[in-house]
Amino acid sequence: KTIKEAIVFDGEGAPNEIITIAPTHFSFDITIEGRAAHAGVDPENGISSIHIAADLIPRLPQGRLDHETTFNIGTIKGGNVRNSVPQNTIINGEFRSPSIETLDGLKMQVIEAINQVKAKYQEANVDNQIYANFKSYKIEKDNPLAIRIASAIKSLGLSPKTKCSGGGSDANIFREKGINSVVVGMADHNMHTLSEYVIISELVTAAKLCELLIKKIKD
């Protein structure tokens, strides 16, 4: 049978929270190739890819740019040993927003920053890839699945809440495939940090919500 609906337990927060807006997510990979040289004997002949990366990164945005847009440098990998001018550095980053215009502007900012660095360090090679990982979506108030979820939440004695999220989930991909998908909270907090935790009582409620929704489908 063709799957028509999906309830995704992947939201940060309590299970009474329903995600109604999620962003489009872009990744970018910047590869910088300088020239290796002995750091103590012949540094003049080297081109430090790490130094170029350090010049490039401040030209890019960082953090929360507005209420629905974020930009982040996630990893920097460069050099092999301390006594060699580093030849290769890779910068991996991302930006997210539900706004197409904002995303287009950020893509241009990344490209412009790279072009500035290319012009400044002409003996180095600076390449980049910018690509979309998943697309944004918006759940309308009359979405039948969201309405059923809200009703089930009320049946558990809770008040349903809707919110925007900067995170992505299976729902982004499912919705691209034509599957009406809604994300609810899974009792997780401080996601993607060393202080991430789950509130057990919320997790139990999430399980009860899942059970109730399955029973409603069977009925």
Question: Which residues make up each language-model segment?
Answer:
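Midchain, well-structured core segments that form catalytic/ion-binding scaffolds
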Residues: 1-135
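Glycine/charged-rich beta-loop-alpha catalytic/anionic-binding loops adjacent to active sites
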Residues: 31-37, 156-157, 188-191
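Alpha-helix N-cap and loop-to-helix initiation/capping positions
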Residues: 48, 141-144, 198-202
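Active-site-adjacent substrate-binding region
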Residues: 51-66, 134-181
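Generic hydrophobic alpha-helical scaffold/packing signal
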Residues: 74-77, 94, 111, 150-153, ...
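Zn-dependent metallopeptidase/amidohydrolase metal-coordination segment
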Residues: 76, 158-217
